[in-house]
Amino acid sequence: MATFKDACYYYKRLNKLNHAVLKLGVNDAWRPSPPTKYKGWCLDCCQHTDLTYCRGCSIYHVCQWCNQYGRCFLDDEPHLLRMRTFKNNVTKEDLANLIDMYNVLFPVNQKTVNKFINNTKQHKCRNEYVPQWYNHLLMPITLQSLSIELDGDTYYIFGYYDNMKNINQTPFSFVNLIDMYDKLLLDDVNFNRMSFLPLILQQEYALRYFSKSRFISEEKRQINHSHFSINILENLHNPNFKIQITRNCSTMSVRWNEACKLVKDVGTYFDILKTSHVEFYDVSPRCRMFTQHKLKAVSKVIKPNYVTSNHRALATEVHNCRWCSVNNNLIVWNDFRLRNICDNILNFIRALIKSNTGIGHCSSQERIHIYIRDVFDVCDESKWNASVVGIFNCLEPVELGNAHYILLNHEVNWDVANVLIQNIGKIPQILTLNDVITALHSMIYDWFDVRYMRNTPTTTFTVDKLKQLCARRKTVDYDSGVSDVE
């Protein structure tokens, strides 16, 4: 059993404040939610289990039981998960406030210990001090947290997470902030709590405390598209697709890291809870991460042999050719923008090949083919640059002075011609490597200008940022007929 979950279950009965704050979905009647095979720690109840996606941010971080309350660490309501979430520069004072909150919600004193021991003996006829019966008393106060970085903002979700060596398929990594506080002060807090426990339980408490307070922080995990709801990935091909998210909101107006102080003023806390409500947002999936996912999908299904062919048709419209025909039934082609990018890039590269080499058939096995797939993923700059340089060198450039040049005297389609005119001023007959890079960049940036995109989608915005975008009507920056340039 998860220690944090058990502590919330038993301490919830202590008083009115605890009953409101420590209410977890995992301790209530089960309501079904989409099952998944993602393993990790539920941020709400801290147990290691199968996770489902959060309705607030679309990241897999909540178990199927806690999902019924729809809590997210990015909410603007003072529920327990939000009060345990700290942001960016965490100070010693912030950590002291967190420890105070733990002491308020999970007190360990003689009265509390006697009450729990008497209840256990009375109801279960248990006269021994077996740790599993007193799991709720054995939750030490630590500065153990799961951390995630979202576009420059780092979030720390504090809690007591068991079994830290278990499989972690989430973008959250364990971080120990004890050095930001004071080891001796934290030791003193826990030794004081431990002194009220029977000797056998003291030993177990000490083992748990030191194992969770002296560990070395993990390296940051890189968030990627697989950490988000599969529903999003399945609909990315639709240019009009919107992500629907819900956020728990209230009139809480404290500094982000000071939310945990609200439990010290019970009256104010319940006044804020009375203003709690749910807000719904439709946001765009446009971000660097999902754009890269789409561009990689294109690179996997194109036919590199097209660049050495003589077909009159565009790359996505070639039929009955063993080497050049693509499967037009694939869902990736439902996005006309990806189709346009594919047609233009391959048309431009083919024109360069025809202008500078004698290759004349799509069945040819050429060295240049190995560079074609990587020229679509502009988000991976190093690999993209290497592929463009590889293509350029395969065209046997001529050196004049300190520069290398290639020819362009083969026809290109109208879209490619417009790109060249827009960026170079005319359709040139001689190109440098920089000209080629500029042209290829423009063919992608016209639709997906990743230079100005967030890495993660707007589902990871805080509520105040979502409200700002909503006020300017920019939560959904999509239009099926307008490119980034337009």
From Swiss-Prot:
Region (RNA-binding) location: 1-81
Segments for region (Interaction with host IRF3): 317-486
Biological role: Plays a role in the inhibition of host innate immunity by inducing the degradation of key host factors required to activate interferon production such as IRF3, IRF5 or IRF7. Associates with components of cullin RING ligases (CRLs) including CUL1 or CUL3, which are essential multisubunit ubiquitination complexes, to modulate their activities. Recognizes the host NF-kappa-B regulator BTRC through the presence of a DSGXS motif in the C-terminal substrate recognition domain.
Cellular component per GO, a single term: host cytoskeleton
Source organism, top-level taxon: Viruses
Record's comment on post-translational modification: The C-terminal region is phosphorylated by host CKII/CSNK2A1. Phosphorylation of the DSGXS motif is essential for host NF-kappa-B inhibition.
GO BP: symbiont-mediated suppression of host cytoplasmic pattern recognition receptor signaling pathway via inhibition of IRF3 activity; symbiont-mediated suppression of host cytoplasmic pattern recognition receptor signaling pathway via inhibition of IRF7 activity; symbiont-mediated suppression of host NF-kappaB cascade
Residue numbers spanned by region Zinc-binding domain: 42-79
Subunit description: Interacts (via C-terminus) with host IRF3; this interaction leads to IRF3 degradation. Interacts with host IRF7; this interaction leads to IRF7 degradation. Interacts with host CUL1 and CUL3. Interacts with host BTRC.
Keyword annotations from UniProtKB, A to Z: Host cytoplasm, Host cytoskeleton, Host-virus interaction, Inhibition of host innate immune response by virus, Inhibition of host IRF3 by virus, Inhibition of host IRF7 by virus, Inhibition of host NF-kappa-B by virus, Inhibition of host RLR pathway by virus, Interferon antiviral system evasion, Metal-binding, Phosphoprotein, RNA-binding, Viral immunoevasion
Record lineage: Viruses, Riboviria, Orthornavirae, Duplornaviricota, Resentoviricetes
HAMAP family assigned: ROTA_NSP1 (MF_04088)
Coiled coil: none
Domain description: The integrity of the zinc-binding domain in NSP1 is important for degradation of host IRF3. The pLxIS motif targets host IRF3 for degradation; however phosphorylation of NSP1 pLxIS motif is not required for its activity.
Motif (pLxIS motif): 480-483
Organism whose genome encodes this protein: Rotavirus A (strain RVA/Pig/United States/Gottfried/1983/G4P2B[6]) (RV-A)
InterPro entries in the cross-refs: Rotavirus_NSP1
Location of the motif IKBKB-like degron (ILD) motif: 479-483
GO molecular function annotations of the record: metal ion binding; RNA binding
Location of the region described as Important for cytoskeleton localization in the Swiss-Prot/TrEMBL record: 82-176
UniProt xrefs under Pfam families: Rota_NS53
Protein's recorded name: Non-structural protein 1
